[in-house]
């Protein structure tokens, strides 16, 4: 990671840099890319997907005016738990604070919206029984979309699949085991057990339902 940071500093001479993703939190593996946001004094906004030190980059470079101008914090959600490497102007620190405040201020989905999503999962489950082309598509859609629905039901912000899976493994290992079984062998029975996990968490969080 340090070698890549040094190379990026030499290439872009940034005013600041914040690393996020797997290299920043120590979960990187052989196929991980290096995620970072760089702030420059001038120039154009660009995305660097080149390879440095054998690692593919996923680096966004922004001129400072991009951050100084009115912007949507949602656009920078990925830096919420990033590591600030450098920050001459203080703009990256302010941006990260803004992103965190945005996340905390975002209202968690309530009972009715979660119930609608849960009912959608039940409908998708029923449609997987068809066993045809469309049924197999519904199965894939159910497995994908239900991960975010799970996060909503338990009251956690959805930061993407990787963080959601890690959260589940750490805080709800039983649910993770059931979900993994459904991913590994998406039979109707395994999918049904996963939906039952969603139903159980919904009933726990919204006991009046």
Where are these regions (language model features)?
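Short gly/ser-rich loop at a beta-strand->alpha-helix junction or flexible surface loop bordering the NTP-binding
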Residues: 14-23
């Amino acid at each position: 990671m340090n070698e890549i940071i040094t190379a990026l500093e030499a290439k872009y001479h940034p005013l600041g840099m914040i690393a996020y993703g797997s290299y920043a939190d120590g979960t990187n593996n052989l196929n991980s890319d290096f995620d970072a946001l760089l702030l420059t004094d001038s120039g154009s906004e660009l995305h660097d997907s080149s390879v440095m030190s054998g690692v593919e980059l996923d680096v966004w470079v922004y001129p400072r005016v991009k951050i100084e101008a009115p912007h949507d914090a949602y656009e920078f959600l990925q830096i919420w738990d990033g590591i600030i490497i450098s920050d001459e102007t203080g703009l990256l620190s302010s941006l990260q604070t803004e992103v965190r405040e945005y996340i905390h201020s975002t209202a968690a989905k309530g009972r009715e919206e979660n119930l609608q999503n849960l009912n959608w999962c039940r409908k998708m489950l029923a449609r997987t029984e068809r066993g045809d082309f469309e049924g197999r598509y519904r199965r894939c859609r159910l497995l994908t979309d239900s991960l975010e629905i799970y996060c909503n039901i338990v009251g956690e912000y959805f930061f993407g699949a990787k963080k959601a899976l890690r959260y589940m493994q750490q805080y709800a290992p039983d649910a993770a085991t059931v979900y993994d079984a459904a991913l590994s062998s998406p039979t109707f029975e395994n999918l049904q057990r996963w939906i039952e996990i969603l139903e159980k968490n919904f009933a726990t969080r919204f006991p009046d339902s």
